[in-house]
Design a protein with these regions (language model features):
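Glycine-rich oxoanion-binding loops at beta->alpha junctions
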Residues: 1, 51-107, 116, 155
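Short glycine/serine/threonine-rich phosphate/pyrophosphate-binding segments
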Residues: 16-26, 48-49, 93-95, 115-123, ...
């Protein structure tokens, strides 16, 4: 294989516990192929537009650094929520991007992210094709939301699901500790705007929660209160998992009932929060049961101390293959994972046309949502259980996990 030019790798959107494993895979593939310069985008495409570019060989120098990188949460390179404008009418943005690529002799462009990030790969590869450019653009899937199409699942989801299941198991044990002398309810709010994959993972706790609510089905507050009241007659400890994005039949987010924020993120998505606190107040008001809420927030995406080994390995392989595919001439594609067998668990990897991926959202199948929209089926458990298997021990220093971070040297 003849390698011409250099490679650059970027990270975008919400970080995960294994996004750096994909970076490690891409770096190793580039080193194995003999690429001279391995660049990183500091803060994604937004940083790239400002020529904030890193020489990764100066930061990830050896196998020990790679091993530590795979144990480091968040986005090592820094992330962004910058959305590229449409090509038409904004050609100057794309001309600037390609002039920077040419300045650094970059022929291979890898971008790690979710739906909106894959749209960046699509637009750049489309521009290159329309203007006779030779650069290759590949997408590496990354999202704890697990909502990218085509691929069976997304790197990042398995570790987030493992954290959620582990935390639910511990929360249930804590709430059970008071026995018959106090009735209390805990609402656990979990990320998930339109797709409930993360909240569904609560069912992976061996002593799983009493109720699970996903955004795929309409939420009925009156039915919710009735179910909690019935549970309170049967048991003293009630634990409920809810997606932040659950909606009423009229399409409004439940969190809006509490006067939730109207702020938008960089991709134009409404920022959601407060559904757990609202439902806890509703329970206490309507049933008299003491209730409180727990919001996992960013913890569910950065808990590198409880990652899934399966997830780490698959994220690494996705990054490695993305670089290999780019070196072979592929462009405008995203790496995909296909499950060949669930028992024993075996997967294969491929790449797929980015046009069939960008801005397409995959939700939990409705047939996997049971009990009138309050739980998930055994089919979901069968699907998700292998993704959380295995663990990787952190390296410890001074009693806490050791991570790797960008040093001051190595800036271009």
């Amino acid at each position: 294989m003849s390698i011409k030019g250099n490679i650059i790798i970027g990270q975008s959107g919400g970080p995960t516990a294994v996004i750096n494993s994909s970076l490690a895979g891409a770096i190793d593939a580039a080193k194995d192929a003999g690429v001279k310069k391995i660049y990183g985008m500091h803060y994604g495409i937004e940083g790239f537009l400002n020529e904030d570019i890193i020489d990764l060989r100066k930061h990830v120098k050896n196998s020990q650094d790679v091993s530590l990188l795979k144990r480091t949460p968040s986005a090592f390179l820094g992330s962004c929520r910058y959305k590229l404008p449409k090509i038409e009418g904004n050609e100057e943005v794309y001309e600037k991007i390609f002039s920077i690529l040419e300045k650094y002799d970059i022929q291979y462009f890898l971008y790690t992210g979710g739906n909106d990030s894959m749209d960046t790969v699509k637009m750049l590869s489309d521009y290159a094709a329309a203007h006779g450019k030779t650069q290759r653009f590949m997408g590496i899937p990354k999202t704890i939301d697990n909502d990218l199409p085509v691929t069976d699942h997304c790197p990042g989801y398995g570790s987030a699901a493992k954290y959620i299941a582990t935390s639910l198991k511990e929360i249930i044990a804590d709430n059970d500790s008071y026995g018959p002398y106090r009735t209390s309810a805990v609402i656990v709010e979990i990320m998930g705007r339109h797709a409930g994959w993360l909240t569904a993972a609560a069912a992976l706790a061996n002593n799983s929660p009493d109720l699970i609510y996903l955004p795929e089905v309409d939420f009925d507050p009156d039915d919710f209160v009735k179910r909690v009241g019935e549970l309170a007659k049967e048991k003293n400890s009630i634990v409920i998992a809810v997606s932040e994005g659950i909606k009423l039949a009229d399409g409004r987010f439940v969190c809006e009932l509490s006067g939730g924020s109207d702020r938008l993120d960089g991709f134009g998505h409404k920022q959601l929060s407060g559904v757990g606190a609202f439902l806890a107040s509703l329970i206490t008001e309507k049933t008299g049961v003491k209730a409180r809420s727990i919001e996992f927030s960013t913890l569910q995406r950065c808990a590198s101390h409880v990652v899934s080994r399966t997830d780490v390995d698959e994220a690494y392989n996705a990054g490695y293959l993305a670089a290999q595919k780019a070196f072979e001439g592929n462009t405008g594609e995203m790496i995909t994972i296909k499950v060949e067998s669930r028992r024993p668990y075996l997967v294969s990897y491929d790449s797929f046309d980015i046009h069939q991926v960008a801005n397409v959202e995959r939700k939990v199948p409705l047939e996997w949502i049971i009990n009138d929209g309050t739980y998930v089926s055994d089919e979901f458990i069968e699907y998700a259980r292998p993704l959380i298997m295995g663990q990787i021990e952190p390296y410890y220093s001074a009693g806490v996990p050791q991570h790797i971070s960008l040093s001051k040297e190595g800036k271009e």
